[in-house]
């Protein structure tokens, strides 16, 4: 099964579980969790079921395309369900079966790994899912997002697209993966991986990045004063990515690192609170009324 077919299979499966299929969010981020489709939608009582592929940029993990499984940019297939179904684990195992992985024939383990994202003020109970000794998925029940307690609880399933495809295709090097017939992962991503690694470690203008962080932070705060959650959150994402670029260059000290993370977290918490209040003023329109109908 090539990677393109694998993604389509996951999309079809989770669509059958009433998840809407979204496109990736167009601002740089380090993980699918940071998309507003997860971060903001996990806030408040409104139900939400969605899936999407999210390119995830982690500058410090770049290896110029020379490492078989560490990348500047990888992909995650993200599934979020609120409230979390009682049978979410069974649903997940069912998705593996659709990919040709019979849970009865493989060693599948849920290894406790509680999750935290200090930049966004998020935390939850979590497990890594190991398939025959390889981690392929992160499974999380959100307890807190943006400093707010989650009720109802949102479940998040994050498939590592490249890792899962490597297992299915029995490839040791991610660049050897077949994306679709006749086209490899290397054909599509190798040049970008090399150049982005060189940028992250060698050529980025750190003075400019320091200025950009401050500029993005001010703009996020300014948009919050206007009550504009989504524009403000876009700039928080830009702050996060800019910080990651600075961190990759090694120009941020241990003390400064904590300070930068704190600045991002403070903005994220303000945004979470404002988003909750804005939905509350609307009467939480996606909450079902008695009889199963939604507010329109």
Swiss-Prot record:
One of its GO terms (cellular component) is cytosol. GO terms for molecular function: ATP binding; catalytic activity, acting on a protein; glycine-tRNA ligase activity; transferase activity. It catalyses: tRNA(Gly) + glycine + ATP = glycyl-tRNA(Gly) + AMP + diphosphate. The gene is glyQ. Keywords: Aminoacyl-tRNA synthetase, ATP-binding, Cytoplasm, Ligase, Nucleotide-binding, Protein biosynthesis. It comes from the Bacteria. It is an enzyme of class 6 (ligase). Tetramer of two alpha and two beta subunits. InterPro entries: aa-tRNA-synth_II/BPL/LPL (IPR045864), Gly-tRNA-synth_heterodimer (IPR006194), Gly-tRNA_ligase_asu (IPR002310). It comes from Listeria innocua serovar 6a (strain ATCC BAA-680 / CLIP 11262). One of its GO terms (biological process) is glycyl-tRNA aminoacylation. This is Glycine--tRNA ligase alpha subunit. Belongs to the class-II aminoacyl-tRNA synthetase family. It holds the Pfam family tRNA-synt_2e. It is found in: Cytoplasm. Its EC number is 6.1.1.14.
């Amino acid at each position: 099964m090539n990677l393109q077919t694998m993604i389509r299979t996951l999309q079809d499966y989770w669509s059958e579980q009433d998840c809407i299929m979204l496109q990736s969010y167009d601002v740089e981020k380090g993980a699918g969790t940071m998309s507003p489709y997860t971060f903001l939608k996990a806030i408040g009582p409104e139900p939400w079921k969605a899936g999407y592929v999210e390119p995830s940029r982690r500058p410090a993990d770049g290896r110029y395309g020379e490492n078989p499984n560490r990348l500047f940019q990888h992909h995650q297939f993200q599934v979020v369900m609120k409230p979390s179904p009682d049978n979410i684990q069974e649903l997940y195992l069912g998705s593996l079966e659709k990919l040709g992985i019979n849970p009865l024939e493989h060693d599948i383990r849920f290894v406790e790994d509680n999750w935290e994202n200090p930049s966004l003020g998020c935390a939850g109970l979590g497990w890594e899912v190991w398939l025959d000794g390889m981690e392929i998925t992160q499974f999380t029940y959100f307890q807190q997002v943006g400093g707010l307690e989650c009720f109802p609880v949102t479940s998040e399933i994050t498939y590592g697209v490249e890792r899962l495809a490597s297992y299915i295709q029995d490839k040791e090097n991610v660049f050897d993966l077949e994306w679709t017939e006749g086209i490899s992962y290397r054909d599509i991503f190798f040049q970008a991986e090399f150049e982005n690694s060189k940028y992250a470690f060698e050529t980025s203008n750190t003075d400019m990045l320091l200025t950009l962080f401050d500029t993005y932070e001010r703009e996020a705060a300014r948009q919050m004063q206007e009550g504009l959650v989504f524009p403000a959150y876009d700039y928080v994402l830009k702050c996060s990515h800019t910080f990651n670029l600075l961190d990759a260059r090694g120009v941020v000290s241990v003390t400064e690192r904590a300070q930068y993370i704190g600045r991002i977290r403070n903005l994220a918490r303000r945004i979470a609170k404002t988003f909750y209040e804005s939905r509350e003023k609307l009467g939480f329109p996606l909450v079902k009324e008695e009889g199963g109908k939604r507010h329109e």
